[in-house]
C-alpha cells in the first residue's frame, strides 16, 4: 500500500501518492531489486526532472540488493548523460548493482546514512543450454565484469587490480569503509536543513 499525501492550496485540495510528492522535490527512490520495469521508471523520472530544471540536483535514494546488470546500466548511463548532478544516498543496503549506482553519483555528492551497508561483488551468471550458447554467455559475463570493474576503478580511484581482487567475493562495507574505499564521499546522520531537498 502506497501512502497518499493531501496538499491544500488556493485552488483546493490535491492528493498525491508519496513518491509523486517526493518527485516534486527532485527525490527518486530505488527501493527494490533492479529490473527493467524499475529502470524504465527511474530513467523516465530523471529525464522528466532534467526537462523541468537542468541546473538543479536530483536525489536518488538507494535501498537495493542489486539485480539486472543491463537494467542497472540503463540507469547508470542516464545518470551520466543528463545535465543535473545526481546525488546518490544509500539507506539500508546498496549491494551489487545498487552499490555500483551509488558510486556512479556525482563526485562529492555520494552519501550513506550511518547504519547502511554497501556490498560489491562480481556479476553472477548461470549459463544453460547448448555448449555454443554457454560459450557466448561466458564471454558476455566476462565483458560485463571487466566493464563494471573499470567503471568502479574510475569512480573510486582504486587501481583496477584491487577492484578485481575485492569483487572476487561478496565484499560488505560500513559507510566509513565505503568512504575510505571511494564508493561514497560522505556519511551523514542529519540533513543540514529540514527540507526534502536539503541533502547536498
Swiss-Prot record:
Molecular function in Gene Ontology: ATP-dependent peptidase activity; ATPase binding; serine-type endopeptidase activity
Lineage: Bacteria, Bacillati, Cyanobacteriota, Cyanophyceae, Synechococcales
Active site, per annotation: 96 (nucleophile), 121
Top-level taxon of the source organism: Bacteria
Subcellular location: Cytoplasm
Keywords: Cytoplasm, Hydrolase, Protease, Serine protease
EC number: 3.4.21.92
Gene Ontology CC: cytoplasm; endopeptidase Clp complex
UniProt-listed Pfam families: CLP_protease
Protease keyword on record: yes
Main location: cytoplasm
Family from the record: Belongs to the peptidase S14 family.
The protein, known as: ATP-dependent Clp protease proteolytic subunit 2
Quaternary structure and interacting proteins, as annotated: Fourteen ClpP subunits assemble into 2 heptameric rings which stack back to back to give a disk-like structure with a central cavity, resembling the structure of eukaryotic proteasomes.
Gene3D superfamilies xrefs: 2-enoyl-CoA Hydratase, Chain A, domain 1
